[in-house]
């Protein structure tokens, strides 16, 4: 069971990725984690990536693809894997295909931009503990104060409406093209494509995923 999740930041991919990995016993593979692990292990690919990152350069697709290929060949990926944050572009998706990594399910979480802005800009964080609240869905007992310590909660820079809108713009300009790409792949029988309504309750989305993947 090899899965890719698509959807804008704040569409609920992280929550459902956890559900899928726990339910089906497959690892979630994040390119960021993979890069850090390869650098820590001092592998040849890791050393190459470190040189580029130390110079402030982006790690090229061919190196990332080599890392993905190496990672999915490991024992814990025998039953499958869930790719997190990759591919982001059509050349990356093509490269995955060219090295023989096939994808069984592409799952898109569809949430309107205004809902995402409301979701993300309503988040409040207690910096010391990482506890997270939401002014609408999970408010603290006292406005803008942490329930346990009474300390101030903050709105992270990443969650400010203008930042969220910028990130959504990037998503629509780049990653959204993958939606068309994988729908075309599904039409040719190369994968299965499902679009889920990400505005539903978390449990409802999880139930839908369970039906699709079981």
Swiss-Prot record:
GO terms for cellular component: cytoplasm. Pathway: Purine metabolism; AMP biosynthesis via salvage pathway; AMP from ADP: step 1/1. CDD domains: ADK. The keyword Aminoacyl-tRNA synthetase does not apply. SUPFAM superfamilies: P-loop containing nucleoside triphosphate hydrolases (SSF52540). Its EC number is 2.7.4.3. ATP binds at residues 10-15, 123, 132-133, 200. It is found in: Cytoplasm. This is Adenylate kinase. It comes from Histophilus somni (strain 2336).
């Amino acid at each position: 069971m090899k899965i890719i999740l698509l959807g804008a930041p704040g569409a609920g991919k992280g929550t459902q990725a956890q559900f899928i990995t726990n339910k089906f016993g497959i690892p979630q593979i994040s390119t960021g984690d993979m890069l850090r692990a390869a650098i820590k292990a001092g592998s040849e690919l890791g050393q190459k990536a470190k040189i580029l990152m130390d110079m402030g350069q982006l790690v090229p697709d061919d190196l990332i693809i080599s890392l993905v290929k190496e990672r999915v060949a490991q024992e814990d990926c025998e039953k499958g894997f869930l790719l997190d944050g990759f591919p982001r572009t059509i050349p990356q998706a093509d490269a995955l295909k060219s090295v023989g990594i096939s994808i069984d399910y592409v799952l898109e979480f569809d949430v309107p931009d205004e809902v995402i802005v409301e979701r993300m800009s309503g988040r409040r964080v207690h910096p010391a503990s990482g506890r997270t609240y939401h002014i609408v869905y999970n408010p603290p007992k006292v406005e803008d104060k942490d329930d346990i310590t009474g300390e101030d909660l903050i709105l992270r820079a990443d969650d400010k409406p203008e930042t969220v809108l910028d990130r959504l713009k990037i998503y629509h300009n780049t990653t959204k093209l993958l939606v068309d790409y994988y729908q075309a792949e599904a039409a040719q029988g190369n994968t299965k494509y499902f679009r889920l309504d990400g505005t539903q309750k978390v449990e409802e989305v999880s139930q839908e995923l369970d039906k699709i993947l079981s």
